[in-house]
Amino acid sequence: MLEIWEDAIQSNAWPFVEAKKILDSLNGKTPEKGYILFETGYGPSGLPHIGTFGENARMVMVQKAFEQLSSIPTKLICFSDDMDGLRKVPSNIPNSEMLAQYMDMPLTSILDPFGEYESYGAYMNAKLRSFLDKFGFEYEFYSSTKCYKAGMFDEMLLKVLEKYDEIMELMLPTFREERKATYSPFMPICPKTGKVLQVPIEKWDAKRGTVTYKDEDNNYIEVPVTGGHCKLQWKPDFGMRWAALKVDYEMYGKDHLANARLYSEICRILGGKPPVQLCYELFLDENGEKISKSKGNSISVDDWLKYAPVESMALFMYQNPTRAKRLFFDVIPQNVDAYITFNQKYHLEEDRAKRFANPVYHIHHGHVPKIETFGITYSLLLNLTSVCNPSDKSVLWGFISKYAPKATPNTTTYLDRLAEFAIRYYDDFIKAHKSYYTPSEKHKVILRDILDMLSSISEETEGEVIQKSIYDIGMKAGYENLRDYFKDLYQILLGQNEGPRLGTFIKLYGIKEMKKLIERKL
């Protein structure tokens, strides 16, 4: 364990950095409950999305890193805020107009518009669990409704009542004057309608364990705060939950950062110890704007998995969680190729600290599969697809088999999947945007020089040799910036502004095929 500790700390990989923070917070002691509790949250008003995957994937990376550094048992819970009242009717579900009658009702008290479960909240919870199970996450599921109604939070809810004034002193300065007049940490559940009420509390009684409010008929209604008769506002709820469940580690998006101090302070007021926390940045679209489900400027998990393996998505989540990242379709090929590079480096590396620093160690929790692509990248396959416009992957395999005779669809399954992904990505994102440049007389001279060079070499010539020869032709052509030279070649030959190392690409595509392509352009 000591050797692993030293190498893990030396690696400076962020999951190990976070795991050490948890250990430091324990002062060398195992918690009284006997385990370390990691918590992720889910708002079941909408379907699980790529952010849900990201938070859970990152959380498990920290959990597994902690398990490498300590023998203290761990547990991960996914907490669903399914007792929240419906504040807005979602537009992207069937029978959405039916939900309008359930405004302010707890999500678990609303009929399922899909007709599959006992409630809308239950439907969304089932989707979450199915989603997490699909990716192999090991977790315990907690329902806010069940926790409140089963009395799991009763002790802490009575403490909130005891500390009512102190909590109000903390919360009120954060609101505008209008909200200050009506705010209370408790939201009673209306005995008549079942709605979650945001009403002023007229009286609170710590001894009786009740709060009193006025209903719409101006009658005073007294309800217990325990047993699911009240729910806390979301900010106090966060801190109360930390105290009640004794959460040791939580991560949340930047949209929570301004309130994190409140969560922690409420946890302390209730006698709890706030968890170690990580605030991760939110995703941006290609224009640098915040991603919004309502705007439709995001990528769904299904979108990503249509074009790339899941580990490439996990790599995107691993990289720099505290830095804002653009999430759009162009990042998919980049992350696939980055994953391939990291995977190859991992298996060549003998230094354990450097292995610990490699993202694939954390993506696969220390059990990294060895993949073989014979030097063929996703980007290279996209460019190959671009010139041969295949109807299915067997066309690509015709070129792959010549380039790497040992590779077959059955033995090189990762590469086979990439070929399939590449065709889908090309069809959906590249094909419609291709724009070929008509070669000028100067370009025709260059193309003839490349054609002569290719005619003078054999099929066995290495890609690097071909690359250098093409480079030399560009130098001879008098380009001040060779990036412009290669850009011209990409536009003429591939119909795009960027492309692969041409030597490697020609080796994969075949010298004979490349000569035919150039002849067509001439």
UniProtKB/Swiss-Prot annotation:
EC annotation from Swiss-Prot or TrEMBL: 6.1.1.6
The cross-references to InterPro entries, in alphabetical order and at most eight, read: aa-tRNA-synth_I_codon-bd_sub2, aa-tRNA-synth_I_CS, aa_tRNA-synth_I_cd-bd_sf, Lys-tRNA-ligase, Rossmann-like_a/b/a_fold
* Primary subcellular site in the record, as a coarse category: cytoplasm
Coiled coil residues, start to end: none
Span of the annotated motif 'KMSKS' region:
290-294
Cell location: Cytoplasm
Family in the record: Belongs to the class-I aminoacyl-tRNA synthetase family.
What this protein is called in its record is Lysine--tRNA ligase
Q: Say which species the protein is native to.
A: Rickettsia canadensis (strain McKiel)
Give the organism's phylogenetic lineage.
Answer: Bacteria, Pseudomonadati, Pseudomonadota, Alphaproteobacteria, Rickettsiales
